[in-house]
Amino acid sequence: MKNIVVFASGSGSNFEAIVKACNKKIIDANVVLLVCDKKDAYAIKRAKRLGIECFVISPKDFASKYDYEKTITLKLASYRVDLICLAGYMRIVGEELLSKYEGKIINTHPSILPAFNKSNCFKIGAI
């Protein structure tokens, strides 16, 4: 069975939907961890209620984005991560996470991507 780690910043409604879909076997995987960048996010309460481990980590506690993401990758190393789902994670993912989990990250995005200048989407982190 595949292991999913979900990243969220807010209410966690998408996180909860993913967990429930896994529990109902709609998705053949297990959510093994929630990574949350906001200590007051409602997603943390959802994780506790659903029995999912939560790793709360604030980028404000680090000197650089690299240091922040390196700490996350060190945490993830203790899991067999098959997929990272960015579900309401309100940060642009940097090179440290992208290179370590290349081809294993998907994003749910509330924006209409055509609203971004197509020639600049990758540069600004929209895709």
Map each language-model feature to its residues.
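One-carbon transfer enzymes
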Residues: 1-127
